[in-house]
Amino acid sequence: MGARRIDGQAVNGERRRLAEVIPLDTPYAIAMFPIYACNFKCSYCIHSIDVKQRPHVVDKVVMDMGLYKKIIDDLQAFRIPSTEETIHNSPPPEVLKALHFAGLGEPLMHPDIVEMVRYAKEQRAARVLDIVTNGALLTENLIDGLVAAGLDRIRISLQGLDANMYR
């Protein structure tokens, strides 16, 4: 797969001040928590506490694809219009600006993360799809798969001053 520039530039290169668009007609962004597990044990995080001593947010550690697809399908009210729809519906409806794969766990641990990104992109669930990750599980194949699936941005979270503190 060829390289593609991925940066933090705003959609269409334009930024609008939040004060100009409030109140919003739709949610600005949705945070999706695909997994409740992590490959790190950062001192500030609930995953550093022994499993027996911490309450689970959910009974299932991994979000199943059926539930995920239902959530994405339910977001259709905020879907990005196609070019044809934009021509016939003027002005285009407000859309969800961003879908973030993040949360109480490491999203790249989900076995179907590439398919999750692909499904969200196919459904035009948001203008921007991104993942917040600690980066430890990134491989060339995974990066290629995520980019091919339509991921717009990967954000690496560094939460420490040195390697020992980070791990």
Predicted features and spans:
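Conserved nucleotide-binding/hydrolysis micro-motifs of P-loop NTPases
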Residues: 161
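Conserved phosphate-donor/acceptor-positioning beta-strand/loop module used by diverse small-molecule
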Residues: 156-158
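Conserved alpha-helical substructure of the radical SAM core
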Residues: 2-153, 164-165
